[in-house]
């Protein structure tokens, strides 16, 4: 199983934004939609070996974490266009209004789609037994990293990135790696990682 853990620093946690202007009104949920597209969609098929956690930390009621579980997801639920994916996120946020407190309990919204009040740190703890990698400039060249055959998890930020506090939290538990010398779009990083794992035969 491949896991991607994405921190969405400003993504709204309620449906108080316009679908006609996702970049300008949603805290860049459009970036999350593209990241999900890159995580799951191939040209003529759908990746069932992927799990994605997105922790939304924007207004008005952070945090909200949405988990997308590839083995249970139906491709018709997560269509490749941004608008369709945004509507799935909205459905999860609306369902998440019923969650109270800081519980890590998840609520299934659709087959393979779950929402919770988990923090970014909760998600990391939940995946602590995975082989954790954090995508950051200055990390080890991904081409030179020897990945295990399974249970790999990749942690990355949105356009804002991970904070210094996040990186300190991850020290000693996640290996810092990089796909190149520049800052890349989250969706592009996920695509690159997926392609690289395909190439080297990691399921």
UniProtKB/Swiss-Prot annotation:
Q: Which residues are listed for S-adenosyl-L-methionine binding in this entry?
A: 135, 157
Sequence intervals crossing the membrane = none
**E.C. no:** 2.1.1.257
Q: Which reaction does it catalyse?
A: pseudouridine(54) in tRNA + S-adenosyl-L-methionine = N(1)-methylpseudouridine(54) in tRNA + S-adenosyl-L-homocysteine + H(+)
| UniProt keyword list | Cytoplasm, Methyltransferase, S-adenosyl-L-methionine, Transferase, tRNA processing
Keyword Cytoplasm in the entry? The reply is yes
Annotated protein name in UniProt: tRNA (pseudouridine(54)-N(1))-methyltransferase
Which species is the source of this protein?
Answer: Pyrococcus horikoshii (strain ATCC 700860 / DSM 12428 / JCM 9974 / NBRC 100139 / OT-3)
């Amino acid at each position: 199983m491949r896991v991607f853990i994405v921190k969405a620093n400003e993504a709204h946690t309620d449906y108080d934004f316009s679908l006609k202007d996702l970049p300008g009104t949603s805290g860049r949920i459009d970036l999350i939609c593209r990241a999900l597209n890159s995580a799951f969609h191939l040209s003529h098929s759908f990746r069932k070996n992927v799990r994605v956690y997105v922790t939304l930390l924007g207004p008005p009621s952070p945090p909200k974490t949405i988990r997308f579980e590839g083995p249970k997801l139906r491709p018709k639920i997560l269509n490749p266009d941004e608008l369709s994916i945004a509507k799935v996120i909205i459905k999860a946020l609306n369902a998440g209004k019923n969650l109270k407190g800081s519980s890590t309990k998840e609520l299934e919204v659709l087959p393979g789609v779950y929402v919770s009040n988990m923090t970014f740190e909760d998600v990391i703890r939940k995946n602590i037994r995975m082989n954790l990698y954090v995508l950051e400039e200055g990390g080890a060249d991904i081409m030179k990293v020897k990945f295990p055959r399974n249970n790999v998890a990749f942690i990355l930020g949105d356009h804002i990135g991970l904070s210094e506090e996040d990186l300190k939290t991850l020290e000693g538990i996640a290996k810092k790696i990089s796909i190149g010398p520049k800052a890349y779009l989250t969706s592009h990083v996920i695509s690159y990682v997926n392609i690289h794992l395909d190439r080297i035969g990691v399921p």
